[in-house]
Regions:
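N-terminal beta-loop-helix "entrance" segment that forms/cooperates
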Residues: 31-52
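Glycine-rich phosphate-binding loop
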Residues: 46-84
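Active-site-proximal loop->helix
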Residues: 19, 24, 43-47, 74, ...
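Single conserved hydrophobic/aromatic residue that forms the stacking wall/gate
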Residues: 1-12
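C-terminal binding/interaction regions
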Residues: 10-13, 17, 92-165
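Short, ordered loop/turn segments at secondary-structure junctions
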Residues: 34-36, 63-64, 85-88, 112-113
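Acidic, glycine/proline-rich low-complexity segments that act as flexible tails and inter-domain linkers
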Residues: 29-31, 41, 64, 76, ...
Length: 165
C-alpha cells in the first residue's frame, strides 16, 4: 500500500510526525509541496493520477484558506485526510475551510497541526483487510497506553502537602 503526503511550505516540519509513524509502520510514502493556488496544474495531475498510481490514502496539509485538501478530494475517489495548519487566525480558518466541504466532496479532518493523528488515521484505513498492519497499529496503541500508565506511576511518587493520591 502506498500513501501520499502533500502540503506547501516546510512540508517536512508540518508532516514530520505523520512521516515518522508511517516509517515506523513500514508504509511506503512520499512527501511533496503543492499549492491549490500556486501550482493548480500539478495538483490536478496528482489528484487525477493518484488512484492509477496505487495511492490508497492522501494526507494533505494546508493553512489559511486551506483549499488544497478540498481541491484534491474533488478530483479523486481516494480518501483525503486534511491537516489544518496554524498559520493565521490560530488555524481556525484552515480548520473550517477543510471541515466544511460541500456534499459529495468529503475530507476527513484532524485537529489543527494534527499530522500525527492524520498518520494514525491513514494507517487505520490502510489496515482494513491487512492483519499484519492491524497488529502493528495495535502494538503502537498499546505503547501509548503504557506511556500513560508510566506517567501515573511517576506522578504517584510526587509529594505535596495536600496531594491526596
Amino acid at each position: 500500500d502506498r500513501l501520499r503526503s502533500r502540503g506547501l511550505g516546510d512540508v517536512y516540519k508540518r508532516q514530520e510526525k505523520a512521516a515518522k509513524l508511517l516509517d515506523e509502520m513500514e508504509i511506503p510514502f512520499e512527501m511533496h509541496a503543492l499549492s491549490a493556488h500556486r501550482t493548480p496544474a500539478e495538483v490536478e495531475a496528482f489528484a487525477k493520477g493518484a488512484k492509477g498510481r496505487g495511492i490508497k490514502v492522501i494526507i494533505a496539509a494546508a493553512g489559511m484558506a486551506a483549499h488544497l485538501c478540498g481541491v484534491i478530494a474533488s478530483m479523486t475517489t481516494v480518501p483525503v485526510i486534511g491537516v489544518p495548519i496554524n498559520s493565521t487566525l490560530d488555524g481556525m480558518d484552515a480548520l473550517l475551510a477543510i471541515v466544511q466541504m460541500p456534499p459529495g466532496i468529503p475530507v476527513a479532518t484532524v485537529g489543527i497541526n494534527g499530522a500525527l493523528n492524520a498518520g494514525i488515521l491513514a494507517v487505520q484505513m490502510l489496515a482494513v483487510g491487512d492483519e499484519q498492519l492491524q497488529d502493528k497499529l495495535a502494538a503502537y496503541k498499546e505503547d501509548l497506553k503504557k506511556k500513560i500508565v508510566k506517567a501515573n506511576e511517576e506522578l504517584a511518587k510526587v509529594s505535596f502537602k495536600y496531594k491526596m493520591n
